[in-house]
Amino acid sequence: MNVGIKGFGAYAPEKIIDNAYFEQFLDTSDEWISKMTGIKERHWADDDQDTSDLAYEASLKAIADAGIQPEDIDMIIVATATGDMPFPTVANMLQERLGTGKVASMDQLAACSGFMYSMITAKQYVQSGDYHNILVVGADKLSKITDLTDRSTAVLFGDGAGAVIIGEVSDGRGIISYEMGSDGTGGKHLYLDKDTGKLKMNGREVFKFAVRIMGDASTRVVEKANLTSDDIDLFIPHQANIRIMESARERLGISKDKMSVSVNKYGNTSAASIPLSIDQELKNGKIKDDDTIVLVGFGGGLTWGAMTIKWGK
């Protein structure tokens, strides 16, 4: 059985925050932010918009793109680190709001690696033969856990959501190879402070980890698929920082024109990062049926996930 993406959708809130916003209260500048991160702007949800609202909008698009009805979905997995509340989960809320019926629904927390973790998890369920249309959503409202007094992190994060329907696809298409892992010894470098409820990051250590693991994990899944870097049509890394992304691309050994860059428009949107990039490249015509694509993410935990996928239903 070939398991892959049957439907796709993404959503970014309307409100756009440019770098000039931060110049008003932080010792920073558009020039510095752009040079060090590649970020020019990011989308922030309104106060009355929560993660489940972002996830809902992306899910509607994915369901429509797959040509199915909500009642055809037999499981919901939401990757998020910013659920509306500890429970019920965002997936539970989506189940009710979409009208899928009483299907299994759960949130999966692997921070910025969450979308990779959830896609790989969904593949296993479909491969078992017991599930046929699994809604996987990566959604985060990072603006609510961003410390706006911390110059090193305040400028980095945005909000958004992306969704896919994972199920059986045509011969020769779908997920070819994958990897996920974690290193708990690095958890202290990227975490949510239990006292302040805000994100804390040791940027130097996270940078070193990210460059190494994104490049190495991408290389391993390409090799596992019996491919070479020359076979890759598009590389879509987690959009954390342009310098991390460029270093990972170089380690993988692909040309700059084959790497998706959306960090300039969205910032780091955690679990929504990779699907927002997919959305951009679909709209730009850079993703076509039968293209071979490498997806890779890293996040708090520390965690990582990667896959090669042959695009198409």
Swiss-Prot record:
Annotated GO biological process: fatty acid biosynthetic process
Pathway: Lipid metabolism; fatty acid biosynthesis
Alphabetical list of SUPFAM superfamilies matching this protein: Thiolase-like
Keyword ATP-binding applies: no
Principal cellular location given in the protein's record: cytoplasm
Catalytic activity: malonyl-[ACP] + acetyl-CoA + H(+) = 3-oxobutanoyl-[ACP] + CO2 + CoA
GO MF entries: 3-oxoacyl-[acyl-carrier-protein] synthase activity; beta-ketoacyl-acyl-carrier-protein synthase III activity
Superkingdom assignment: Bacteria
Gene3D superfamilies: 3.40.47.10
Residues annotated as catalytic: C112, H238, N268
Region annotation (ACP-binding) ranges: 239-243
Pfam assignment, any one: ACP_syn_III_C
InterPro entries named in the record: ACP_syn_III_C, ACP_syn_III_N, FabH, Thiolase-like
Enzyme class: transferase
Keyword match Nucleotide-binding: no
Transmembrane segments: none
Localisation: Cytoplasm
EC number: 2.3.1.180
Listed GO CC annotations: cytoplasm
Keywords: Acyltransferase, Cytoplasm, Fatty acid biosynthesis, Fatty acid metabolism, Lipid biosynthesis, Lipid metabolism, Multifunctional enzyme, Transferase
Domain comment in the entry: The last Arg residue of the ACP-binding site is essential for the weak association between ACP/AcpP and FabH.
Functional description taken from the UniProt entry: Catalyzes the condensation reaction of fatty acid synthesis by the addition to an acyl acceptor of two carbons from malonyl-ACP. Catalyzes the first condensation reaction which initiates fatty acid synthesis and may therefore play a role in governing the total rate of fatty acid production. Possesses both acetoacetyl-ACP synthase and acetyl transacylase activities. Its substrate specificity determines the biosynthesis of branched-chain and/or straight-chain of fatty acids.
Protein family according to the UniProt entry: Belongs to the thiolase-like superfamily. FabH family.
Subunit structure: Homodimer.
Protein name per the record: Beta-ketoacyl-[acyl-carrier-protein] synthase III
Organism for this UniProt entry: Staphylococcus aureus (strain MW2)
